[in-house]
């Protein structure tokens, strides 16, 4: 939905530019990352059916008329159990605190469950403009949607309510227009052609992690991470990427490798295809699997993911 023509940092003579930060808050798998990708028009945040796949703040940028909107995709809000969980939830609330507008995303198909109620309860004291976004509405009957919207607005005074399908784009254009009209006047934060503040090597690692989760959603626990250890632009215009999938135990390494390396090969093929499409370059990807015991307690790993290490 990048429909703008204004230069970054300036204003046209006819139209004053606008810009602002919009945080997306919701329970795991509410569809936050899918919505970010839909509004931006390309992938900047990974999407899987496995919950809690977004770990750090991911900023996607789109332009609507004279407005530049910076979307902050946060980790899902849930009750943390592990150190990594605590870091993710803290990061999510930190992203919301600095935003101009907060989109509260609720999975309409899941209904008014415990996660939705806890999320709404936590939003009562938030001062920023709050917008309720009911997602996956194409899977829910209209009377149920109306009841859900009424209950949510009864708990929290939302400025607006939108009913959308982030997956197929239904309702997203109206949401984009509203955000463009609601962010403050001011110069753009980023160049016109920039769609994310995430370095490409980090996005490439996130894409590989997505393919890892999609392939091994039943078998692989969350104790895994992917790091891009080498990125080389070659003279022929191609890119050589070396990445490592880190797991905590030898048994997990065997799962990721698969029989005769077939599983990691399939993960690499899927990741390479998508990275190549985004870069519009030939990609030579070399994927390794290594054991790094207790990486979930290593402060350096948290810094690499953009998370504060909780003590």
Curated annotation (Swiss-Prot):
Keywords: Cell inner membrane, Cell membrane, Cytoplasm, GTP-binding, Membrane, Nucleotide-binding, Ribosome biogenesis, RNA-binding, rRNA-binding. GTP binds at residues 26-33, 73-77, 135-138. GO terms for cellular component: cytosol; plasma membrane. It is found in: Cytoplasm; Cell inner membrane. Residues 164-166 are annotated as: G5. Residues 73-76 are annotated as: G3. One of its GO terms (molecular function) is ribosomal small subunit binding. GO terms for biological process: ribosomal small subunit assembly. Residues 135-138 are annotated as: G4. It holds the Pfam family MMR_HSR1. It is a peripheral membrane protein. Residues 26-33 are annotated as: G1. The keyword GTP-binding applies. Residues 216-293 form the KH type-2 domain. The keyword Cytoplasm applies. Residues 18-185 form the Era-type G domain. Residues 52-56 are annotated as: G2. Belongs to the TRAFAC class TrmE-Era-EngA-EngB-Septin-like GTPase superfamily. Era GTPase family. Monomer. An essential GTPase that binds both GDP and GTP, with rapid nucleotide exchange. Plays a role in 16S rRNA processing and 30S ribosomal subunit biogenesis and possibly also in cell cycle regulation and energy metabolism. This is GTPase Era. It comes from Brucella melitensis biotype 1 (strain ATCC 23456 / CCUG 17765 / NCTC 10094 / 16M). The gene is era.
């Amino acid at each position: 939905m990048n429909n703008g023509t204004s230069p970054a940092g300036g204003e046209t003579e006819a139209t004053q530019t606008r810009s602002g930060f919009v945080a997306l808050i919701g329970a795991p798998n509410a569809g936050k990352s899918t919505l970010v990708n839909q509004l931006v028009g390309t992938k900047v945040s990974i999407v899987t059916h496995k919950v809690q796949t977004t770990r750090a703040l991911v900023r996607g940028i789109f332009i609507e008329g004279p407005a530049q909107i910076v979307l902050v995709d946060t980790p899902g809000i849930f009750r943390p159990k592990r150190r990594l969980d605590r870091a993710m939830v803290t990061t999510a609330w930190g992203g919301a605190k600095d935003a101009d507008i907060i989109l509260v995303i609720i999975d309409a198909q899941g209904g008014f469950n415990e996660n939705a109620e806890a999320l709404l309860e936590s939003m009562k004291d938030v001062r920023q403009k709050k917008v309720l976004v009911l997602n996956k509405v194409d899977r829910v009957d209209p009377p149920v949607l109306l009841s859900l919207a009424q209950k949510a607005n009864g708990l929290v005074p939302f400025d607006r309510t939108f009913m959308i399908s982030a997956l197929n784009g239904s309702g997203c254009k109206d949401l984009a227009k509203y955000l463009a009209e609601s962010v403050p006047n001011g110069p753009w934060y980023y160049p016109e052609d920039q769609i994310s503040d995430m370095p490409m090597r980090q996005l490439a690692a996130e894409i590989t992690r997505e393919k890892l989760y999609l392939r091994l959603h039943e078998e692989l626990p969350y104790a895994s991470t992917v790091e891009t250890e080498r990125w080389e632009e070659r003279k022929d215009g191609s890119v050589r990427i070396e990445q490592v999938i880190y797991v905590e135990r030898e048994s997990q390494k065997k799962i990721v490798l698969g029989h005769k390396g077939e599983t990691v090969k399939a993960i690499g093929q899927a990741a390479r295809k998508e990275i190549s499409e985004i870069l519009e370059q030939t990609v030579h990807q070399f994927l390794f699997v290594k054991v790094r015991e207790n990486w979930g307690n290593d402060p350096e790993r948290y810094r690499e993911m953009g998370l504060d290490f909780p003590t």
